[in-house]
Amino acid sequence: MEVSPFYEKQIECIHCKKHFPTFKVRSKNIRVMSTASDFQPVYSDTQVHAYFYNVLVCEHCGFSFTEDFTKYFAPGTTELISAQITSKWVNHTFNGERSAEKALEAYKLAYLCAVLKKEKHIVIAGLLLRLTWLYRELKNEAQEKRFMKMALDQYMESFSNEDYARTQMSDERVMYLIAELSRRLEDYQTATRFFSRVIERQRNTLEPKIIDMAKEQWEILRETRNQTAQQ
């Protein structure tokens, strides 16, 4: 009998402390074929998108979060979430397989909860980047660009106050994303500046792959700017 790529896991809500079930993808079924220049994974099995399941939606109170959220709630935020989310929540579950549309709904809930909870800019940026990927999956270019710009703004804020310290995000990775999202949004000046800053670190980095990606995108950017200048 074929084993499902999904398994059910019990999660404790960090807001209401109740437990709820959610689907997760078995690690052996996560097969990334390639990665886009903004880190969107391309899976060999198009039916199994692991990042669709990153958001945990509490069926009891509606609070939606990822493993990147802290368990700390700043004073007043618990009450704000109860008023803005829980009081309007109609009990329903996000357990089960998720389509791109269902994942989009979950990520939008998580984004709202992150803003109300006053999560770090780096966490909010990650949610917005994945919303960008989802709209790309759905071939909605206008919304893809909209959320890309929102993600870029949050990465800029995070870089300015270094709130990504002690996370899995390095200086190089944050600067690279600022550069690449700027390039995609045709802000070539910002893209040039930040790609340069990443490449400058090539002799003293723990992220050689990011340096290589920055060089590749720098070349694409240079060609684009040359073509634009010739028009």
Predicted features by range, described:
Residues 95-96, 110-124, 157-168, 203-207:
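Flexible helix-coil transition and linker loops at the boundaries of alpha-helical arrays
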Residues 123, 143, 147-150, 163-171, ...:
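Structural signature of alpha-solenoid helical repeat junctions
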Residues 152-156, 188-206:
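TPR/TPR-like (Sel1-like) alpha-helical repeat modules
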Residues 106-109, 113, 147, 154, ...:
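Alpha-helical solenoid repeat scaffolds, predominantly canonical TPR units
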Residues 79-94, 101-109, 116-140, 170-184, ...:
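Amphipathic alpha-helical repeat scaffolds of TPR domains
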Residues 1-80:
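N-terminal cysteine/histidine-rich coordination modules
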